[in-house]
């Protein structure tokens, strides 16, 4: 019987390396692919912790040699620039906080890689994400949280459709991180104790403010800090320097603590308020993607997650007729941030998600 071929996205880290080893052990014909994303991503990190640095490519190639599998470097620089880097700078210019890792997962690591794997004759792609895909008797796929709650990455995968999940494997979803490092040792992989990669691979030293000064100088223009009524309180150094919920570094003398509660890019204004005003009861989200066979049309109770690393909260999801959803939280949520992703769960199953647009106090 002919082996099924799988392309493993190999970053040179321990997770993707063990993914390749596990699938080979399970009988797949494994092909390793490292994605070349940009010159900035390649040069951003000198200690090899960036997923795209030259040393990380070398690590991926070394692991492939040890496993005896072919390894290729594929060029994704054009779509990465257009769909990730440009999006990153444009969102900051709009007074929003982008999530470039989700954009990369969506457009590059899955949509882009799935398209290119056809040229390699592969039936599947696999990554080192800590998540699971299960299939019911009727053929419906469910994207689920990884077993390791501390490492679960289902939040960044809500864009996976039923069609895509038919060709995606997540071998690590049933394991904890410590187990993966032990497996890497058992397989004799040199990356067993390699440090985690940095969050924004194309930003040198993770200094996004310096990066924006160079690539999006319009976000660094000084402007007014006001309260909700428009009363002038001070001057800011550029809206990209501020995040929702921020207290420190405002440079305002006031009788009570003030926090950033909104960013108004149209007027280049940072809006501040009390700690109570940092909380929101509702929001609308757009640019929706659903893991379900069909998008939901009726209101339903969900667990909603408003940022990576934060626990889900009880909420009521009400699909609107214009391709957006309204979300009403059972309890007010702190620092709900436009531009970030909101992901909807039922139990450990991801229903879908979208981008936070408007926030209601």
Can you say where each PLM-predicted feature lies in the sequence?
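ATP-dependent adenylation/nucleotidyltransferase module used to activate substrates
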Residues: 1-158, 169, 178, 185
